[in-house]
Regions:
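Broad gene-expression machinery/nucleic-acid interaction feature
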Residues: 2, 77, 102, 116-118, ...
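Gly/serine-rich nucleotide phosphate-binding loop at the start of the catalytic core
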Residues: 1-71
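Acidic carboxylate diad motif detector
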Residues: 46-147, 299
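Generic detection of short hydrophobic beta-strand segments and adjacent strand-loop junctions
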Residues: 1-5, 126-131, 189-192
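Long, hydrophobic, amphipathic alpha-helical segments used as structural scaffolds
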Residues: 30-37, 82, 86-93, 159, ...
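Positively charged, helix-rich recognition surfaces that bind polyanionic ligands
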Residues: 13, 24, 123, 135-138, ...
Length: 409
């Protein structure tokens, strides 16, 4: 659960100090890890922690002014980062910069507590929040982050509350799009808020302001040398914060719309069938004529958040006893006639109504694709709504994909 904090000016300084201490601890631990590795040793969390505890008070006596966990959690995060690196799930950890990385620090569950619309943080004290914690249960972890001029607390809560199961055996196909975020096979349409398009003018003005201030700075300082880091003045910092606030609002609107849609779908349907969209290929740059129009389409596709829509369904459906089925990437859901099954040779993006050349059936293009996805999932789902298994889908058979629950094709 992520809630916004409402700290006093003094508490803002204390929160920024704690985030700075966490950054210092991370950078020191990463340098120590690399030093031990270059010396032929096998660094670990325990060895780096022992070296940190022995050196921190002599090198950084001001660490005592911040919560203890702000200096400990970076070491745990670094150990996790190296595990992900060696498992080839992430890149090599890098040093954190004050201007580049998001200020944050972690707090263990026994160090803070919530009481209504306020939370008690160690050393900092009681901090007001914009809303109360929605979930009741044991708090597992907490992390305070600074985003677009606001402080947030993210708390993981072990909640044991009842989630109603979806009707048994219900199945739906979903076609994702730009104009309409999701079209369901039963005809339901979920509108796309298009948050980025509504904020384009404000974002354009903010970026112009940043560009003007950077040009003025570079004119005063002369040509920049290779690798030189230019200072950021107060006016430039204010302009960057204005742009960051616009981006944060766009992200919040998009996240809110997707959360509401996926929660309603997960509580209504037992089996949900999505197509495996190749977003990176869909948003590849065009060359020559039409590249400006393609750039606008790319922005709209990325603004819709197809990947986030699928990610949320993947973890919400099992909570309601449901299953997510992912159709094969090259399954022609838009070109197949949902009435007779005949595939059209071509279908342009401008054709919003599907008309079958064989049987004459006419239907909305997006709903036709959603019905085909629903039919594909029904062929591989038992009457009770179980998982799709190899062999159930004929030529579209494919092993079950771990982490996404099921894959069709």
């Amino acid at each position: 659960h992520r809630i916004a904090l409402d700290p006093t000016p003094a508490q803002r300084i204390a929160l920024a100090r704690a985030a700075g201490c966490a950054r210092v601890a991370w950078n020191w631990a990463l340098a120590e890890w690399k030093r031990k590795y270059d010396a032929g040793e096998k660094p670990s969390f325990r060895t780096v922690q022992a070296a940190w505890n022995a050196a921190k008070h002599g090198l950084f006596p001001w660490l005592k002014e911040s919560p203890k966990d702000a200096n400990l959690t970076p070491l745990l995060d670094l150990a996790t980062a190296f595990r992900n690196y060696f498992a080839k799930r992430a890149k090599y950890p890098r040093f954190k910069s004050k201007g580049r990385d998001v200020p944050s620090f972690g707090i263990s569950n026994d160090k803070f507590r919530c009481d209504g619309r306020k939370v008690r943080l160690p050393v900092i004290g009681w901090v007001n929040t914009r809303q109360a914690l929605r979930f009741e249960g044991r708090i597992l972890t907490g992390r305070v982050t600074f985003t677009a001029g606001r402080w947030f607390l993210s708390a993981a809560v072990e909640a044991d509350h009842f989630r109603p199961a979806a009707p048994e055996g219900s199945i739906v196909g979903i076609d994702l799009g730009v104009r309409t975020l999701a079209t369901l096979s039963d005809g339901t349409k979920i509108e796309n808020p298009r948050a980025l398009r509504s904020a384009e003018k404000r974002l354009h003005r903010a970026n112009l302001s940043i560009a003007r201030k950077r040009r003025a700075r570079d004119k005063a300082l002369g040509p920049a040398k290779k690798g030189e880091r230019r200072p950021i003045g107060k006016n430039l910092a204010k302009a960057c914060k204005r742009a960051a606030r616009v981006h944060a609002r766009v992200a919040s609107i998009r996240s809110d719309a997707i959360h509401k849609a996926t929660t309603r779908i997960a509580a209504t349907w037992t089996t949900v069938v999505l197509e495996d969209l190749h977003v990176r290929g869909m948003t590849r740059r065009a060359k020559g004529r039409g590249r400006v129009a393609k750039a606008g389409l790319n922005r709209s596709i990325l603004d819709a958040g197809f990947g986030e829509f699928r990610r949320q369904l993947a973890y919400k459906l099992p909570l309601h006893g449901g299953t997510l089925v992912v159709a094969p990437r090259f399954f022609a859901s838009s070109k197949l006639c949902s009435a007779c099954g005949v595939k059209r040779a071509s279908l342009s993006l401008s054709e919003r109504t599907f008309a079958c050349d064989s049987c004459g059936y006419s239907v909305d293009r997006d709903r036709n694709a959603a019905i085909n996805l629903c039919t594909l999932g029904a062929r591989g789902t038992h009457a009770c709504g179980g998982e799709v298994r190899p062999g159930d889908l004929g030529r579209w058979a494919h092993p079950v994909e771990a982490g996404i629950v099921a894959r069709a094709g």
